[in-house]
């Protein structure tokens, strides 16, 4: 029955797991979510605005929404402003350290009305709605995170990327995050980097 024999647990000191205790995974305590339900707007019109702000900082997002000439900007602006106020009041986050880690638009119910026409006929009016979800994330702990990554050898860094959740890996390897935290140069030197970037 050696095939079903359990593997012995290694008693080695796992520095990656220890470091992960101080920096929680997505959805634990460094995120705040705001949802807007049944906003009277089509999904496509809201999504073209949402795609422009995903992954950006809070201040940059507000500036973009104020200057874009679309009607969808106002309800999205209100949602993000409300999410930042909740993060500042409820969790004592600094607004300067918030980024839009997740922004999505889903189709809502379609309101139907009847428009009377000539000769007793009627036409159907369809008013589409959408549900918008905004997730703000505090990146304060990432100030020391890039220094920790720079101290690792390429082999250990690749092992760390393998232990990360998919959400944290995408956030670490996205272009805007690399530019903001100046960790672009040493990540490009690592073998298998492209393998993780496309995931």
From Swiss-Prot:
Keywords: Chloroplast, Plastid, Ribonucleoprotein, Ribosomal protein, RNA-binding, rRNA-binding. Pfam families: Ribosomal_L22. GO terms for cellular component: chloroplast; large ribosomal subunit. The keyword Mitochondrion does not apply. One of its GO terms (biological process) is translation. GO terms for molecular function: rRNA binding; structural constituent of ribosome. InterPro entries: Ribosomal_uL22, Ribosomal_uL22_bac/chlpt-type, Ribosomal_uL22_bac/org-type, Ribosomal_uL22_CS, Ribosomal_uL22_sf. The keyword Plastid applies. It is found in: Plastid, Chloroplast. CDD domains: Ribosomal_L22 (cd00336). PANTHER family: CHLOROPLAST 50S RIBOSOMAL PROTEIN L22-RELATED, LARGE RIBOSOMAL SUBUNIT PROTEIN UL22M. Component of the chloroplast large ribosomal subunit (LSU). Mature 70S chloroplast ribosomes of higher plants consist of a small (30S) and a large (50S) subunit. The 30S small subunit contains 1 molecule of ribosomal RNA (16S rRNA) and 24 different proteins. The 50S large subunit contains 3 rRNA molecules (23S, 5S and 4.5S rRNA) and 33 different proteins. uL22c binds 5S rRNA in vitro; the central segment of the protein (approximately amino acids 30 to 124) but not the last 28 amino acids are required for this binding. NCBIfam families: rplV_bact. Component of the chloroplast ribosome (chloro-ribosome), a dedicated translation machinery responsible for the synthesis of chloroplast genome-encoded proteins, including proteins of the transcription and translation machinery and components of the photosynthetic apparatus. Belongs to the universal ribosomal protein uL22 family. HAMAP family: Ribosomal_uL22_B. This is Large ribosomal subunit protein uL22c. The gene is rpl22.
